[in-house]
Swiss-Prot record:
<feature type="domain" description="RRM 3">
    <location>
        <begin position="191"/>
        <end position="268"/>
    </location>
</feature>
<keyword id="KW-0488">Methylation</keyword>
<dbReference type="InterPro" id="IPR006515">
    <property type="entry name" value="PABP_1234"/>
</dbReference>
<keyword id="KW-0597">Phosphoprotein</keyword>
<dbReference type="GO" id="GO:0008143">
    <property type="term" value="F:poly(A) binding"/>
</dbReference>
<keyword id="KW-0963">Cytoplasm</keyword>
<dbReference type="GO" id="GO:0070062">
    <property type="term" value="C:extracellular exosome"/>
</dbReference>
<dbReference type="GO" id="GO:1990904">
    <property type="term" value="C:ribonucleoprotein complex"/>
</dbReference>
<dbReference type="GO" id="GO:0005829">
    <property type="term" value="C:cytosol"/>
</dbReference>
<dbReference type="InterPro" id="IPR003954">
    <property type="entry name" value="RRM_dom_euk"/>
</dbReference>
<feature type="modified residue" description="N6,N6-dimethyllysine; alternate">
    <location>
        <position position="361"/>
    </location>
</feature>
<feature type="modified residue" description="Omega-N-methylarginine">
    <location>
        <position position="430"/>
    </location>
</feature>
<dbReference type="InterPro" id="IPR035979">
    <property type="entry name" value="RBD_domain_sf"/>
</dbReference>
<dbReference type="GO" id="GO:0005634">
    <property type="term" value="C:nucleus"/>
</dbReference>
<keyword id="KW-0677">Repeat</keyword>
<dbReference type="InterPro" id="IPR002004">
    <property type="entry name" value="PABP_HYD_C"/>
</dbReference>
<keyword id="KW-1017">Isopeptide bond</keyword>
Amino acid sequence: MNPSTPSYPTASLYVGDLHPDVTEAMLYEKFSPAGPILSIRICRDLITSGSSNYAYVNFQHTKDAEHALDTMNFDVIKGKPVRIMWSQRDPSLRKSGVGNIFVKNLDKSINNKALYDTVSAFGNILSCNVVCDENGSKGYGFVHFETHEAAERAIKKMNGMLLNGRKVFVGQFKSRKEREAELGARAKEFPNVYIKNFGEDMDDERLKDLFGKFGPALSVKVMTDESGKSKGFGFVSFERHEDAQKAVDEMNGKELNGKQIYVGRAQKKVERQTELKRTFEQMKQDRITRYQVVNLYVKNLDDGIDDERLRKAFSPFGTITSAKVMMEGGRSKGFGFVCFSSPEEATKAVTEMNGRIVATKPLYVALAQRKEERQAYLTNEYMQRMASVRAVPNQRAPPSGYFMTAVPQTQNHAAYYPPSQIARLRPSPRWTAQGARPHPFQNKPSAIRPGAPRVPFSTMRPASSQVPRVMSTQRVANTSTQTVGPRPAAAAAAAATPAVRTVPRYKYAAGVRNPQQHRNAQPQVTMQQLAVHVQGQETLTASRLASAPPQKQKQMLGERLFPLIQAMHPTLAGKITGMLLEIDNSELLYMLESPESLRSKVDEAVAVLQAHQAKEATQKAVNSATGVPTV
């Protein structure tokens, strides 16, 4: 880089080609020796929050930024050389093309630094970039000089020179629109003609005789394979465009040796690919437009439904052009597509079939969306959800096992809930009676589903110190009443309350339990800690459990669960205990206190084990009958 000071008064540097794992701390450690840094920002993707592989480093002084640009450009950070240039905030200057040159036919070994070192002698460089893909250099690059004069010097000296044994082309940078306009202008004055579909018996001489009548030809070539046999196409280069145009007009579509030949303007590979891409996109758009309102997406299909059954289910609503159940490994993926002949038929099918039970499952039927449309919709929905979350500061989503109140409670004052309400709101275990894992939000209150408003932790379930204590003697004596009303200790305390106090009423809606309506109306009940006592073992309280290390907590609960389960199912006690220990600790504490709740969960676990054993027995019987060895 020339010692001349750049014309940019800013002290901000653009740092590109970063490794995805590079952090602001790494960049600070790298650039701080150059001088005081005001800020560093790695630009990130809005959706994934992943690095966009470039950053801005803002120095306090311009001379420090220039020193970093001179000494640190192309230094390696996490195995990748970084590309540094002045930050240009004005997009019109970045895209003007002034001082920007294009270099092509570069050797694969030429990287950003090698190209930078080669062209730095011609002037002050703002940016130097060799275009690469996953396979390395694509053989061309761009160099942006500070001045137009420096770019002209580079073009004059470098165009046609040998670089690593290859002759490079260096020219003024042109935008895509300019290049396409030039190609279009040249296409109208074409001298070269492309001929195809003339068979294998054609050679250069015969092709020259065939097209020589239209005018003088500079060259004629029939393309051949390794054995010298014609590939069925070739080229003729005329001296004048008029002769080439005449050959195309007269020969295109004529029959030659029983075949209809094609004669047209010879195109470069890039032109042909662009034209084919444009044609394909047009066909794709036409197909999308045609099927946009007649193609239906059907999901939640029963495993036994195939293409024929899907067609039969939807055939009463109109003419079906196609019906397809998506498969993977010979098994249904649970969704498919049905295409009707008219929008009216498709609309009627959506109205009638959405929610209808076919086989054993209710169907979901809607108009099919393209992948891009669906991704755009989901992205928009995600951004709206994130915006609503950011609008409520200092709030987090409650973890599984915490319950949200419909009305915020008075600070430091928690309401008392009967055990029956707690039991209904407790999280389900990770296994069910059918042996399937439930959805993470299955059976949860609607208030804590994804997308619902979030609340501070201060409004969550009451602290353990406020849960009424029930001694083991009371628990045994009042087993039959514990799941239908307040616990005896709380009931006795409430009975001793003066009659002038109003007993609070609760309103339970949508599975969400509410706090008491008025603080003054709450009975003055002294809450004590929940205690669980098992014969021959030390009393286990919630605070004692919480103070133990996480790995010790399950052990403490397991030691108290095992003897209780062993009394019910001596042979399966070990397996059942292991299954129950997957449940949340607060649920396990409640189960230790409530024999009914424990027995219910034990019965579910036994049902799961029996179903699993029956399945294994059936599989063994099938394997024995078919001669397949059992593992």
